[in-house]
Amino acid sequence: MATAFLPSILADASFLSSIFVPVIGWVVPIATFSFLFLYIEGEDVA
């Protein structure tokens, strides 16, 4: 029963790549560089 349900989920989830590509390409680097910048510029770094 699960094997018949899985292809319909994968067919309906084809829009996910258009969501994850900008997230991985823009949001993750912005968050990473922002955190690293704030960490490096902080006063209490040993």
From Swiss-Prot:
Annotated Gene Ontology cellular components are:
photosystem I; plasma membrane-derived thylakoid membrane
Excised during maturation, the propeptide residues are 1-11
Keywords of the record, alphabetical order, are: Membrane, Photosynthesis, Photosystem I, Thylakoid, Transmembrane, Transmembrane helix
InterPro entries found in the cross-reference section: PSI_PsaI (IPR001302), PSI_PsaI_sf (IPR036357)
Q: Which Pfam families match?
A: PSI_8
Query: Which cellular compartments is it found in?
Result: Cellular thylakoid membrane
Specify the protein name.
Photosystem I reaction center subunit VIII
Taxonomic source organism: Trichormus variabilis (strain ATCC 29413 / PCC 7937) (Anabaena variabilis)
